[in-house]
Design a protein with these regions (language model features):
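Acidic/histidine-rich helix-loop elements
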Residues: 53-73, 142-159, 185
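N-terminal, active-site-proximal structural segment of metallo-dependent hydrolase catalytic domains
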Residues: 3, 8-20, 29-103, 116-122, ...
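Charged helix-capping and loop-helix junction motifs
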Residues: 193-199
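Short, solvent-exposed loop/turn elements at domain surfaces
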Residues: 58-65, 136, 189, 261-264
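Active-site beta-strand/loop signature of hydrolases that rely on acidic residues for catalysis
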Residues: 49-56, 75-100, 127, 166, ...
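Structured beta-strand-rich core segments of catalytic domains in phosphoester-bond hydrolases
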Residues: 86-180
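Metal-dependent phosphoester-hydrolase catalytic domains
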Residues: 132, 190, 201-212, 220-321
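Extracellular/periplasmic catalytic domains that process cell-envelope and extracellular macromolecules
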Residues: 43-46, 81, 102, 117-120, ...
Length: 321
């Protein structure tokens, strides 16, 4: 009698055991889920990012009703509304950057001023979300025959021109990528072409062969040899006099999704015009999956935050675990 009772007890349904097993399974599922997907948008197939390039117009310009003090809150409003993970700024002066960072403290900053490698002159700085990324390495180089010398200008540029760059590391996953942000000369085509070649060389020779992003005001329309070179379509001449195609061909994120859009002007002189050349770009490596890409026409009653439209793109960089 006792033996039969014991057998019945062993076969009896025990809810606590089932709940215990379910808890274990849930924990395992959650663990692998966190490994493969985190809240920032990363998954096992790549790193999802939202990037903006934004020429904010230098703040000492005599722009009257479009002066910096009358539009600085619109600039910050654009960043708040669209919430990019990374922003490449051009024409930013120290006091402009300070204002933006005070209003949007979640962004860290990478870069130096072009005239002295410190604080004098315009920056092509990079803003990045400090809650998501750390900085592995960073620097700035000058578009000249002496790219390590601050203020150097040997290619006939109307202005000193620079590129600031960084290797950013996603804190949660340890996955990393490079970001290069630049502003090419607005006058000299030979300077722009030499600058594009130097940029491609720096990308090719980066320490870690991880994906890269290039943002900037290229002062070059889509049919300019500079853009065709970066896309791997043609060869152009570098500072050493030789000509070759780039070894790091890129894609224009905007054109991946909008190949036939005609009105793509990005520098509009505060007029809000859309017909003309696109000179602001976000480039990524060939094969990158582009999710969204826009030229932003944000304005307040016909008043614009800058004389350039900001450009944004969301994409998945191929940085698997």
């Amino acid at each position: 009698m006792t033996e039969g009772h014991d057998m019945e007890g062993r076969n009896k349904f025990k809810p606590t055991r089932i709940f215990f097993l379910l808890a274990i399974l849930l924990g395992v599922w959650t663990f692998f889920g966190l490994c493969c997907t985190d809240a920032a948008g990363s998954d096992a197939n790549g790193l999802e990012l939202r990037v903006m390039t934004f020429n904010i117009r230098y703040g000492t310009a005599n722009d009257g009703d479009n002066a910096w003090d009358k539009r600085k809150d619109m600039v910050c409003g654009v960043l708040r509304q669209h919430e990019p993970d990374i922003v490449g700024l051009q024409e930013a002066l120290r006091f402009q950057i300070d204002y933006i960072r005070a209003e949007l403290p979640k962004y860290g900053e990478i870069g130096v001023a072009r005239e002295d490698g410190y604080i004098k002159g315009e920056y092509s700085c990079i803003l990045y979300r400090t809650d998501r990324f750390g900085v592995g390495e960073s620097g700035t180089f000058w578009f000249s025959n002496t790219p390590a010398i601050p203020g150097s200008n040997t290619w006939g540029n109307a202005c000193v021109r620079i590129c600031s760059w960084a290797r950013l590391i996603e804190t949660k996953t340890g996955r990393a990528f490079y970001i290069f942000n630049l502003h090419l000369d607005h006058v000299s085509q030979p300077s722009r072409e030499k600058s594009a070649v130097l940029l491609a060389e720096r990308i090719k020779n980066r320490r870690y062969k991880e994906p890269y992003i290039v943002t900037g005001d290229f002062n070059s329309g889509e049919n300019n040899p500079v853009i065709k070179y970066l896309k791997g379509e043609i060869a152009i001449e570098g500072s050493d006099g030789s000509s070759a195609k780039t070894q790091v061909p890129m894609i224009d994120t905007f054109r991946v999704l909008h190949p036939d859009v005609k009105y793509v002007r990005t520098a509009h002189e505060f007029k809000g015009t859309r017909q003309g050349n696109k000179i602001d770009y976000i480039f990524v490596p060939q094969g990158t999956k582009v999710l969204e890409a826009e030229i932003l026409y944000d304005n307040v009653n016909g008043r614009y935050p800058s004389d350039h439209y900001p450009v944004t793109a969301s994409f998945v960089l191929n940085v698997p675990f």
